[in-house]
Amino acid sequence: MYRLSSCLRRRSRPAGAWVAVGVLMAGCSASVSGDTTESDASSSISATSSQTSTMPPGSGTTSPGTPSDTTATAAQAPFVPRTITVVMNGDVLLHGGLWTTAEIDAADTGRGDMDFRPLLSDLKPLVSGADLAVCHMETPLAPRGGPYASYPVFSVPPAIVPALKWTGYDACTTASNHSIDQGFDGLARTLDYFDAAGIEHAGTAATRQASREPLVMDVNGIKVGLVSATYGTNGIPLPSAQPWSVPLINIAKIERMAARATDEGADIVMVALHWGLEYMHEPTDDQVAIANQLTRSPDIDFVYGHHAHVVQPYDKVNGKWVVYGLGNMVAQQLTSVEGVDDGNSCRVTFRERPDGSFRVQKLEYIPTMITPFDGVHPTRVLNVPQDVDDPEFAQLRPQLQATDDRVGTVVTSLGADKRGVTEGQ
């Protein structure tokens, strides 16, 4: 995985318009099972390079009785499409109660003072089973040993990072309304932790140069670009010396970053937005308008979001998939609002076409649930379809079923199920 790495196979721009030659996770003109409308979106990136023949003219001809030349043979070889699966999750929002959970678990596992791995362990098969898995780090990370701070101005334990890596996350988006809760130093420190753990990141930047470079990852030979931006920073001014450190939602800038990803060989470009209104299941007019503009870009294939802390619908806009809100992946919000403990993992499978582009072959939502913390039993994030009928979780079955029902109702409220979106596991 790398930034701005070059790739021989690119999208060309005939007659001034970009044509996808290999699309990213952004859902450009890909078809979902059961949906005859195509929307491009792919998450595998080809890093193979072609070679130019240096043979003199005529040297490729064959004499009578020799086998047909290799070029003709290659041209007749059957096309074998490649596929790639990408999993995305919503907010990683570490309220103080979750630190207690990690302390309780660390006492059992012996892994330091805090161990967040048990918190996420139920998601590990789903996350690690994807070709590419992307999380969203909502808040800045504190120095090792603290001090730590919870809502409303966060500085959270860095022990979450090795837990995310262990769970199977390859990359995290970092642009959010809390990005500069601890100033530029906190922002840069957070990225340092991700770098040290080998987790790629998109969104916030520690240098001006990095702020201009989209993340382009090589996933089994397919290049996937990722662009991240946020609606704002809770009224905290951007650092005067580093105003570029947090990318705000700006249509023209996002489109330019997506185009740069394409120029650097991205087969698929995905845009992750921190947007919407908290605790609102319905996308706002602004979300709908932004989605309408971004999905018209030939360089953007799939758009998804977070921030509302509740699940929002999936929809197809201009032939491309938009996931308005994934809900919380992990949080402990002290509110009576129904649905803050609900989330969903979005899993998209892309399939290569003969022209080298990728289409969405399958789009799934997997409901997740955050269990309550009672001061004794540690919190867990559960894969709902996997656990709802498991005897181990019999006492939680009513809550699991309620989460399953709520998430399914919201995700399909704009008709995504009629276009082939299904519940996965």
Language-model features: locations:
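Juxtamembrane proline-rich low-complexity "stalk" or linker regions positioned immediately after a signal peptide
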Residues: 40-62
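Intrinsically disordered, low-complexity segments enriched in small/polar and acidic residues
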Residues: 37-41, 46-47, 412, 422
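Short stretches within intrinsically disordered, low-complexity N-terminal or propeptide regions
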Residues: 17-22, 32, 43, 49
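Bacterial lipoprotein signal-peptidase II cleavage site
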Residues: 28-38
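Sec-dependent bacterial lipoprotein signal peptides
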Residues: 1-26
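Acidic, metal/ion-coordinating pockets
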Residues: 2-8, 29, 55, 60, ...
